[in-house]
């Protein structure tokens, strides 16, 4: 099993009131799968995604990645884990505004200690592949939302992570752009064997996933594999 | 390089705020440099004033004379000492003096004074008493019945030019000796000590009064350079022998200048710390604001694998760049202003009295003393780096999830 979550729960302390975002959720994610988390707002999609992505630690339960219990690792180790194995796409893209498109992508490679020339070559190549090769020297605010989203995805996958997590990936994109992006992701999923997990409200994305996990009030209410169609 | 670039780009985000911070550092440092320059200039002039006014660089006495002023403690083997000293290449000028406690009296008043017998010709080459004569004139070489008195003393005992005074003192043989002199000049040096307590007659008449013959109490030496004082003292210790003579440098004779220096440096040290705190708080404020404004961005950076220590490095680097630019600005600005007033001088003619009492000049020429500049810069770097640690540490402690979703 690639990722295994065992009875994970998450309680946030909102001022003095405890908020239970996740109640004893157990899920297994297979390597190379293309999974969607859906459900109403506040159902715990983001929380689950962050726990699977080592971004946060559960209040209860355990998370394993390839059999290693990541929920027990130190903050420093988790950081390194995320850097090597995981790619993130955050809502609203969250690019670094002072850096150009290609530098945003390069940043991850710099964190991995890859040298300057190699870095620029790889970052530019990914941007090219995402159809933004001509725009790589623009700052994020000089790009359209669709273009920014591509940069965000390029940043998430440039270091060839095993797992890519996306939160509200297409929520601010028009139908056509969102659909195009999905095409890219499916391609990567097939070719690079990257495992993808997304949280979304978007029916188009849900439709194209290989597996749909529905959540409500911090619980998984349904989990079905669909026939994958590209 | 990437980190440096990122830090630099972050600084240029809010150009105005960064500029204000750089200015705060720059102006603060420039002010400190100027303040040191002012103090160092003042003290340098005080040193020269004291040396020129009275002490010369070094004085040689019989051991114990400076404290006791006993008339019988004249310099043994005066001629040999004179020849030896004159042969030292560092020595540029020499004069001799007789010094004793005496009583100066008119028909109505009398007062205890320090009677100084000087060789008018040689004295004027070392000290500038002559320039301070306000009324009348300086001593004639053979003016053996002439006396110079300070303006304060003249006022106290009611003396005027050409008045007659009687000077009485204990002679070598223990008897009471007394002569009448005519006031030929009244001086004003600004030093209360000298103006109120010292009177000058010629060396020859003082020797006669005390029955000293050719002997003197004091040899005053001017070296070609003040830096030569310490080596000269070393030389004197060996060549003259320390058991018979005391060889004193100017700042042992007038310790007030050194005391003043210490005091002023302590005051500036305090100001230094205050300025540092202001600069530090200003930098901290800027950096904290800039962190607060990009909480989400920093959260994302951490989420995608930036380690807390890299965040610390980034924020510290931003602090250091701001500070570095400020230091460059402050160094250049402070240096130029200090150099400028070193040429032009800052006049304090309005408060002359207060200044001259402590041997200060009324026009201060500022002076750049590099050790003080370096000290200011190093303190600035240390203190503000230390202060910069706090925002950096705070940024690195952020939880990525909270930063990204709840800010
Ligand atoms: N850091 C936090 N502090 C307090 N409460 C939190 C925190 N994070 C999440 N919650 C709460 O936990 C619950 C689940 O939130 P979560 O963000 O996982 O929902 P979601 O399914 O992603 O919703 P949406 O579709 O709106 O993004 C919500 O009630 C939310 O208010
Ligand atoms: Mg969410």
Which residues are covered by each model-predicted region?
Chain A
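H-loop (His-switch) and adjacent beta-strand-loop-beta switch element
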Residues: 212-225
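A short acidic/small-residue loop/turn micro-motif
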Residues: 227-229
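ABC family nucleotide-binding domain
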Residues: 2-208, 212-215
